[in-house]
């Protein structure tokens, strides 16, 4: 009985509650109805006003988003977590820590939830505290671009670090950009003539190609880079960009002063041919992971806006990968093989795909590559190799013979060494030169044990021509005139092919091999031979 009475009480209470709700709802419904009638009387004017108000709200929301401010909630090494009350900044936006000198820029990398974004710091995070205010800049990191950057050194965020005042550029560009569309790309394969005989003949560079430069310390890598910068400027009127990624500060400083001495950088006038972007070894991983993109952005401006053939040097591309792996671990990503970031191929691909030839101009990239423990199967160099069009190998053995540039003619390769691209004559001469050098290499053991006298007449001729070719592959550089005392030479591709054709045909067998050393074209060899003949005649 008690349960039935309780049930009846519950039902009556429920009916009473529903009737009260309906009574309360009636006035609200009538209010909504009357307001709708009023709005319908106002007509089209109210609709327009509503649209304008909505548009104004959107604009104000955008403005608020651009100037959104947050506060630091966590600092984990080079990674900083920032919380925003509203209007989260998008991925890759730049944030600036308020009231900090020098400026500290953070780049948004992840959205964590609870209005928290995880950022990568572009400078040291020493002294940061929780609660410190952070402002959204409203854009990705932007840097100055254009002719004003020539002869200057800047860091990853575009600030000058050469103590020569601000960079007075009117143009700025974001360091993150899409690769050119397929329709914008040039399909023609064309040689970028460097004026360096051994490169142009045996491992030519393609316009818009990527070249791996392998070389240890002291084999002439820096001098080769400077000569390439100088020759591209003179032959093509093009500019160069040098990105020092994870460089030793001392080496970066030495390169800068050598460029001033070599005339590549003009401190007094406006004849500088190169822009420098440095993210040294002591910089945090965020800066080293992005300085590549800063240099590439400077090069893209010259290609897209000025139609230039730009040369982009990256030293060292391995440090780009290394910095990415450091950042990846701090961001909480699960590492892949050998501890590298799981996004290794994506990071490398998104950067390398921007280096290409378009219908406006080209970016040709020369990338120094460090191979960890000489293991070519390591994921970092292996990922880089997939993007290369040519390899230029500098050999210590050739440098010990005082043959500069010390490029190994047998190890260096190029994808465009193809008769359909370089022409049948060029291809045949290059392969003929390599065959003679390979034959000479295989005869060296016999020569070392038995001597030259035990060789056949044919082998003696091969050795004689190979030694002339080896010496003719040397060349005086314009930027090295102060070291060598020889006047630098720029040798055209036609002149290079003519010279080696004459050697292969035996037309120069009567000339002494010393006449071929440190000469430009074949005409210089004839002059040297005449001088030697006069000296011996006297």
From Swiss-Prot:
<dbReference type="GO" id="GO:0097730">
    <property type="term" value="C:non-motile cilium"/>
</dbReference>
<keyword id="KW-0067">ATP-binding</keyword>
<dbReference type="Pfam" id="PF02874">
    <property type="entry name" value="ATP-synt_ab_N"/>
</dbReference>
<keyword id="KW-1278">Translocase</keyword>
<dbReference type="GO" id="GO:0005743">
    <property type="term" value="C:mitochondrial inner membrane"/>
</dbReference>
<dbReference type="GO" id="GO:0005739">
    <property type="term" value="C:mitochondrion"/>
</dbReference>
<keyword id="KW-0375">Hydrogen ion transport</keyword>
<comment type="function">
    <text>Mitochondrial membrane ATP synthase (F(1)F(0) ATP synthase or Complex V) produces ATP from ADP in the presence of a proton gradient across the membrane which is generated by electron transport complexes of the respiratory chain. F-type ATPases consist of two structural domains, F(1) - containing the extramembraneous catalytic core, and F(0) - containing the membrane proton channel, linked together by a central stalk and a peripheral stalk. During catalysis, ATP synthesis in the catalytic domain of F(1) is coupled via a rotary mechanism of the central stalk subunits to proton translocation.</text>
</comment>
<keyword id="KW-0966">Cell projection</keyword>
<keyword id="KW-0809">Transit peptide</keyword>
<dbReference type="GO" id="GO:0005929">
    <property type="term" value="C:cilium"/>
</dbReference>
<keyword id="KW-0999">Mitochondrion inner membrane</keyword>
<dbReference type="GO" id="GO:0002119">
    <property type="term" value="P:nematode larval development"/>
</dbReference>
<dbReference type="InterPro" id="IPR004100">
    <property type="entry name" value="ATPase_F1/V1/A1_a/bsu_N"/>
</dbReference>
<dbReference type="GO" id="GO:0040024">
    <property type="term" value="P:dauer larval development"/>
</dbReference>
<dbReference type="InterPro" id="IPR000194">
    <property type="entry name" value="ATPase_F1/V1/A1_a/bsu_nucl-bd"/>
</dbReference>
<keyword id="KW-0547">Nucleotide-binding</keyword>
<dbReference type="InterPro" id="IPR036121">
    <property type="entry name" value="ATPase_F1/V1/A1_a/bsu_N_sf"/>
</dbReference>
<keyword id="KW-0406">Ion transport</keyword>
<dbReference type="GO" id="GO:0048598">
    <property type="term" value="P:embryonic morphogenesis"/>
</dbReference>
<dbReference type="GO" id="GO:0046933">
    <property type="term" value="F:proton-transporting ATP synthase activity, rotational mechanism"/>
</dbReference>
<dbReference type="InterPro" id="IPR003593">
    <property type="entry name" value="AAA+_ATPase"/>
</dbReference>
<dbReference type="GO" id="GO:0050829">
    <property type="term" value="P:defense response to Gram-negative bacterium"/>
</dbReference>
<dbReference type="GO" id="GO:0043050">
    <property type="term" value="P:nematode pharyngeal pumping"/>
</dbReference>
<keyword id="KW-0066">ATP synthesis</keyword>
<dbReference type="GO" id="GO:0005524">
    <property type="term" value="F:ATP binding"/>
</dbReference>
<dbReference type="GO" id="GO:0030421">
    <property type="term" value="P:defecation"/>
</dbReference>
<dbReference type="InterPro" id="IPR005722">
    <property type="entry name" value="ATP_synth_F1_bsu"/>
</dbReference>
<feature type="binding site">
    <location>
        <begin position="215"/>
        <end position="222"/>
    </location>
    <ligand>
        <name>ATP</name>
    </ligand>
</feature>
<keyword id="KW-0813">Transport</keyword>
<dbReference type="InterPro" id="IPR050053">
    <property type="entry name" value="ATPase_alpha/beta_chains"/>
</dbReference>
<keyword id="KW-0139">CF(1)</keyword>
<dbReference type="GO" id="GO:0016887">
    <property type="term" value="F:ATP hydrolysis activity"/>
</dbReference>
<dbReference type="GO" id="GO:0007617">
    <property type="term" value="P:mating behavior"/>
</dbReference>
<dbReference type="GO" id="GO:0008406">
    <property type="term" value="P:gonad development"/>
</dbReference>
<dbReference type="Pfam" id="PF22919">
    <property type="entry name" value="ATP-synt_VA_C"/>
</dbReference>
<dbReference type="InterPro" id="IPR027417">
    <property type="entry name" value="P-loop_NTPase"/>
</dbReference>
<keyword id="KW-0496">Mitochondrion</keyword>
<dbReference type="GO" id="GO:0010629">
    <property type="term" value="P:negative regulation of gene expression"/>
</dbReference>
<keyword id="KW-0969">Cilium</keyword>
<dbReference type="InterPro" id="IPR024034">
    <property type="entry name" value="ATPase_F1/V1_b/a_C"/>
</dbReference>
<comment type="similarity">
    <text>Belongs to the ATPase alpha/beta chains family.</text>
</comment>
């Amino acid at each position: 009985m008690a349960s039935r009475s309780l049930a009846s009480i519950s039902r009556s209470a429920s009916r009473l509650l529903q009737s009260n709700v309906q009574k309360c709802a009636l006035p609200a419904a009538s209010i909504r109805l009357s307001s709708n009638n009023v709005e319908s009387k106002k007509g089209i004017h109210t609709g327009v006003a509503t649209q304008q108000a909505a548009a104004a709200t959107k604009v104000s929301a955008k403005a608020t988003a651009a100037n959104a401010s947050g506060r630091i909630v966590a600092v984990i090494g080079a990674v900083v977590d920032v919380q925003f009350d509203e209007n989260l900044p998008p991925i890759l936006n730049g944030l600036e820590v308020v009231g900090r000198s020098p400026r500290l820029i953070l780049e948004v990398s992840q959205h964590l939830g609870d209005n928290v974004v995880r950022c990568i710091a572009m400078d040291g995070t020493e002294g940061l505290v929780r609660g410190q205010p952070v402002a959204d800049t409203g854009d990705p990191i932007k840097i100055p671009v254009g002719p004003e950057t020539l002869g200057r050194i800047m860091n990853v965020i575009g600030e000058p670090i050469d103590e020569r005042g601000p960079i007075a550029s009117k143009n700025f560009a974001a360091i993150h950009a899409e690769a050119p569309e397929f329709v914008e790309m040039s399909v023609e394969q064309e040689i970028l003539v460097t004026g360096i005989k051994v490169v142009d003949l045996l491992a030519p560079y393609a316009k818009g190609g990527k070249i791996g430069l392998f070389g240890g310390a002291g084999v002439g890598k820096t001098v080769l880079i400077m000569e390439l910068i100088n020759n591209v400027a003179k032959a093509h009127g093009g500019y160069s960009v040098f990105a020092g990624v994870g460089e030793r500060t001392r080496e970066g400083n030495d390169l800068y002063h050598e460029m001033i001495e070599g005339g590549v950088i003009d401190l007094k006038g406006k004849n500088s041919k190169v822009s420098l972007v440095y993210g040294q070894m002591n910089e945090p991983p965020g800066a080293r992971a992005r300085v590549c993109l800063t240099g590439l952005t400077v090069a893209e401006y010259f290609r897209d806006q000025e139609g230039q053939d730009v040369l982009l040097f990256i030293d060292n591309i391995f440090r780009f990968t290394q910095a990415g792996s450091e950042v990846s671990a701090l961001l909480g990503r699960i590492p892949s093989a050998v501890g590298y970031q799981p996004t290794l191929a994506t990071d490398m691909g998104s950067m390398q795909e921007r280096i290409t030839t378009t219908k406006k101009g080209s970016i040709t990239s020369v990338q120094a590559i460090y191979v960890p423990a000489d293991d070519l199967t390591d994921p970092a160099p292996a990922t880089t190799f997939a993007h290369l069009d040519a390899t230029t190998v500098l050999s210590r053995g050739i440098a010990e013979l005082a043959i500069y540039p010390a490029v190994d003619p047998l190890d260096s390769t190029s994808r465009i060494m193809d008769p359909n691209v370089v022409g049948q004559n060029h291809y045949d001469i290059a392969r003929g030169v390599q065959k003679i050098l390979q034959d000479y290499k295989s005869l060296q053991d016999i020569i070392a044990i038995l001597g030259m006298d035990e060789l056949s007449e044919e082998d003696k001729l091969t050795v004689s021509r190979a030694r002339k070719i080896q010496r003719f592959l040397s060349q005086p550089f314009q930027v090295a005139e102060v070291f060598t005392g020889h006047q630098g030479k720029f040798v055209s591709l036609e002149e290079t092919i003519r010279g080696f054709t004459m050697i292969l045909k035996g037309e120069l067998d009567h000339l002494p091999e010393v006449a071929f050393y440190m000469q430009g074209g074949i005409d210089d060899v004839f002059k040297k031979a005449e001088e030697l003949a006069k000296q011996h005649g006297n």
